[in-house]
From Swiss-Prot:
Annotated InterPro entries: PCRF, Pep_chain_release_fac_I, Pep_chain_release_fac_I_sf, Prokaryotic/Mito_RF, RF-1
UniProt xrefs under Pfam families: PCRF, RF-1
Protein task: Peptide chain release factor 1 directs the termination of translation in response to the peptide chain termination codons UAG and UAA.
Lineage: Bacteria, Pseudomonadati, Pseudomonadota, Gammaproteobacteria, Pseudomonadales
PROSITE patterns assigned to the protein according to its UniProt record, in alphabetical order: RF_PROK_I
Similarity comment text for this entry: Belongs to the prokaryotic/mitochondrial release factor family.
Name this polypeptide is given: Peptide chain release factor 1
Taxonomy, superkingdom: Bacteria
Cell compartment(s), UniProt: Cytoplasm
SUPFAM superfamilies linked: Release factor
GO molecular function terms attached to this record: translation release factor activity, codon specific
Keyword Protein biosynthesis among record annotations: yes
Keywords: Cytoplasm, Methylation, Protein biosynthesis
Length: 360
């Protein structure tokens, strides 16, 4: 294991000892805020320290067994050789486990997201594919036990959507969906194509983490233009009777968000403001991300929304994930909500990328 990682583990071990003492201090116990903060940190550090203590014990056992390899007794040497092999195997497993424990956590992973799907090149066929992608993610969300709500939709003339914006709520939503941002390309024969020619269309997907209310980016109300209009979306008999839909324009950036799915103008405004905050935070994060990418090229997660990340080829029943050269002949399963088959290899590749950089 790299010396820099061992140093990190030693520092964590010292912090663990310090936290143990603090949590037993009467003054800390009396102050609930500090006690909760220290308890949370203790819970995060404790499993790492337990694994590190086991690592050190096995390392010491290995050193002892290696010393016996020089003994004059052949039976003792044979026994020591077995112990060395066993200790090396355990040590390798513990080293891998500790490295994964030390990987930096994305603070956004636990957040809910705003999922934006927009038809790109390809006209009607692109809009139909946007509808297919929305169904794919909706079914995946259902399998994950997440809740998905439509904030805004602009239907295509022959089905699907020119644009559909949703909010996805649940456990580890951003952690699972964060690498879905980018250009998704579809190759198939449109129903209106009489010659059987394959057409290529594209949609763009953007996944934005919903900011924490306390840490949300500050928005100056004076920099907003708020328009109300009559909803053309859900609402049954109530549609077009009230100006409940909201459109908010952030004047400095030109970013426009709108929400029309609720009957209440107040609810639509609150959801539109949350979405605007997410877009402004994403804009800010993208600038910082570009700096990181220039320093170290990330195989997965470059964050470029124009990057072609995946191709769905219907005639061949094939899905190709271009960032990791993954090809699956399971298109029907993926489109039916089985996109986990693509998401998991992406997350594994990203973790491998992080491991390679750990301790640099």
């Amino acid at each position: 294991m790299k010396a820099s990682l061992l140093n990190k583990l030693d520092l964590l071990h010292d912090r663990y000892e310090e936290l143990t003492a603090l949590l037993g201090d009467a003054e800390v116990i009396a102050e609930q805020g500090r006690f909760r903060a220290y308890s949370k940190e203790y819970a995060e550090v404790e499993p790492v320290v337990a694994a590190y203590r086991e690592f050190r014990k096995v390392r010491d056992d290995l050193a002892g067994a290696q010393a016996l390899l020089k003994d004059s007794d052949p039976d003792l040497r044979e026994m020591a050789a077995e112990e060395v092999a066993e200790a090396r195997e355990r040590l390798a497993g513990l080293e891998d486990r500790l490295q994964r424990m030390l990987l930096p956590r994305d603070p956004n992973d636990a957040r809910n997201v705003f999922l934006e799907i927009r038809a790109g090149t390809g006209g009607d066929e692109a809009a139909i594919f946007a509808g297919d992608l929305f169904r794919m993610y909706s079914r995946y969300a259902e399998k994950q036990g997440w809740r998905i709500e439509i904030l805004s939709e602009n239907p295509g003339e022959h089905g699907g959507y020119k644009e559909i914006i949703t909010r996805v709520e649940g456990d580890n939503v951003y952690g699972k969906l964060k690498f879905e941002s980018g250009a998704h390309r579809v190759q198939r024969v449109p129903e209106t194509e009489s010659q059987g020619r394959i057409h290529t269309s594209a949609c763009t997907v953007a996944v934005l983490p919903e900011p924490d209310e306390q840490a949300a980016i500050e928005i100056n109300p004076a920099e907003l233009r708020v328009d109300t209009y009559r909803s053309s979306g859900a609402g049954g008999q109530h549609v077009n009777k009230t100006d409940s839909a909201i459109r908010i324009t952030h004047l400095p950036t030109g970013i426009v968000v709108e929400c029309q799915e609720e009957r209440s103008q107040h609810k639509n405004r609150a959801k539109a403001m949350a979405w605007l905050a997410a877009k402004l935070q994403d804009r800010q994060d993208a600038a910082a991300h570009r700096e990181i990418s220039e320093t170290r090229r990330l195989l997965v997660g470059s964050g470029d929304r124009s990057e072609r990340i995946r191709t769905y080829n219907f005639p061949q029943g094939r899905v190709t994930e271009h960032r990791i050269n993954l090809t699956l002949y399971a298109l029907d399963e993926v489109m039916a909500g089985g996109v986990e088959a693509v998401i998991e290899p992406l997350l594994s590749e990203y973790q491998a990328d992080q491991l390679a950089a750990l301790g640099d």
